[in-house]
Amino acid sequence: MVDKKSRGHINSDLEFKKKKHAREMKYQVLSFGLMIGLTIVAFLTVATDGVGSWFTIPFIILLAAIQVIFQLYYFMHMNQKGHEAPALFLYSGVFVAFITVLAFVTIIWW
């Protein structure tokens, strides 16, 4: 049998979890809306004839990087505790990819 004190603790714990999930859902919906907006901006940038490719390509890459950050932190839950090891491997991979691209660009354009 559950007494009133433990029942109150269970209810408060349940309320805390509901508020936490509601806050996470709000961030996910906001992030989804921002990603849709960034995608629309990328399409409009390509569709605009007045903007040169020297601006368009780096701008789209920047928008893609921002979307990757939103994907990792809000949809893949990398902002929560317990994801330190996957985050380390992910950031190490990003670092290696950045160095590789930098090396290729340096070799080609130097």
Curated annotation (Swiss-Prot):
Catalytic activity: 4 Fe(II)-[cytochrome c] + O2 + 8 H(+)(in) = 4 Fe(III)-[cytochrome c] + 2 H2O + 4 H(+)(out)
Highest taxon, organism lineage: Bacteria
Keywords from the UniProt entry: Cell membrane, Membrane, Translocase, Transmembrane, Transmembrane helix
InterPro entries registered for this protein in UniProt: Cyt_c_oxidase_su4_bacillaceae (IPR014257), Cyt_c_oxidase_su4_prok (IPR005171)
Bilayer-crossing regions: 27-47, 50-70, 88-108
Keyword Glycoprotein: no
EC numbers on record: 7.1.1.9
Bilayer disposition of the protein: Multi-pass membrane protein
Chief place where the protein resides: membrane
GO cellular component, one term: plasma membrane
Enzyme class at the top of the EC tree: translocase
Cell compartment(s), UniProt: Cell membrane
GO terms for MF: cytochrome-c oxidase activity
Stored Pfam families: COX4_pro (PF03626)
Similarity field: Belongs to the cytochrome c oxidase bacterial subunit 4 family.
Protein name, as recorded: Cytochrome c oxidase subunit 4B
Organism this protein belongs to: Bacillus subtilis (strain 168)
Taxonomic classification: Bacteria, Bacillati, Bacillota, Bacilli, Bacillales
Gene responsible for this protein: ctaF
